[in-house]
Amino acid sequence: PFIEVSLKVVDVEEGTGRNAGKLGALVVEGKDMDKFIKTNVGSGLTDEDRETFWKAKEKLIGQIVEVRADAITQNQETTDEWSLRFPRFLKFRGFEKGEKL
């Protein structure tokens, strides 16, 4: 079973290797069931998404994304922060796949 959560983009990270010069991951955070979640999500992004989103990275900050994951897990470094196990980008809320930001 999967869980789906809506989280806010607070930062972006450049990719490495074959994704250098493109979006590597979205840094997202928010609350779900009274748990503060902060995680990076890069899985689920196509090469085209990575290029397009990197060019418009300033517009991504503050956007809400829908993320699917296996579970919510406790952050190993801090007790008041949670993360997602195997997070996967689904879409930006309010935008359909392929729609321009």
Task: Label the predicted regions.
Residues P1-F95:
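Nucleic-acid 5′ end/cap handling module spanning
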Residues K100-L101:
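Extended, charge-rich, solvent-exposed interface segments
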